[in-house]
Amino acid sequence: MRSIMRNFAGVIVAAAGLLSLASTASIAEGWPQNAIIRMIVPYPAGGGTDVVARIVAKFLQERLHQTIIVENRGGANGQVGLQALKQSQPDGYTMAMTSDSPMTVNPWVYKNLPYDPMKDFIHVTSVIRLPSLLAVHPSLPAHNIAELVALAKSKPGGLSYASAGVGNFSHLEAELFAQATGIELLHVPYKGTGPSSLGLIAGEVQLSFNNVSTLWPYVKEKKLVALAVCEPKRMPDLPDVPTIAETIPGFEIAPWVGIVLPAGVPKPIVDRLTTEILEVMKDPAAVKQFTDQQLVVMTLPGEQFTALIKKDSDKWEKVVKTANIKME
């Protein structure tokens, strides 16, 4: 009798396993199906992350034959949008296109962060690296990094820089530069990338770090001067702009944009979405739209993306603590 019962139990376990596999397969086959997909951008429209999201959404919906709506949910340096993602149903119909700052900087800047970047989200893949540029106002008597550092050291705190807000990546980039060169700069936070760029153009501040795609149009109009890029090597499209690393060896900043899902989304859906996004990022038409805006394709799916988030988080923890940057 016991032998019969054991055999019967084994049959039940095997059947349950088959049902589980069948259920998993049906989930993958059934997604997406007659439902709008939301892609949350935790920033206002018009910024670098938003631009990336709209390009990816356009090509992704063509592959999925499904409508994808880009939903801008800005506020608190990305907290509002990522909290909305955390609270969404883990069914694969809500994702977020986020920059690195809400994932790697916010945990060290904000005391009561409403999400855990490592536990509350599935890290699908990075998609883009956003090269950074250090630009200065034309009136500043510094034509290279060495002259800028010398000028700043001659009057500590006398030079000011614009950021898009406390804890924003443009803030952290400047702090890292100051720490690496031993200079003291005055931080002037603005409410967003647009206002910070306009403040620099107006001469309210002397310098600013931001995405090449954001600042380069003003450089071409001679409203700003490009001092250096934060890439490890000179950019092919900007061969005359030196890197900061040419003066400060090892100095590199590589902001990124990537896609995350709320924790709990079934693995078959995650795998399907990952596959489709990676195909989008190889599409020549999509790549051209990115390169036209000085955006560099960088795909690190799954565990590679998680490792990047962890590495950058450790890096910015040191910068934030050294600069004593805190927000309630």
Which residue ranges define each predicted feature?
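Short, low-complexity disordered leader/linker segments with a strong preference
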Residues: M1-N34, A146, E328
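N-terminal (or domain-start) structured segment
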Residues: A28-K119, G158-S160, V166, G182-F209, ...
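Hinge/capping helix and adjacent helix->loop/strand transition within the periplasmic-binding protein
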Residues: W31-Q33, Q87-Y93, W108-P195, I244, ...
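An extracytoplasmic/periplasmic, membrane-proximal ligand-sensing/linker region
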Residues: Q33-I36, A180-I183, K220, K267-E328
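A ligand-binding cleft/hinge motif common to bilobed small-molecule-binding domains
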Residues: P102-N112, L176-A180, L207-D240
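Extracytoplasmic/secreted proteins, especially bacterial periplasmic and envelope-associated proteins
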Residues: V51, I55, F59, V80, ...
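Structured segments of extracytoplasmic/periplasmic soluble domains
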Residues: Y43, F59, R63, S88, ...
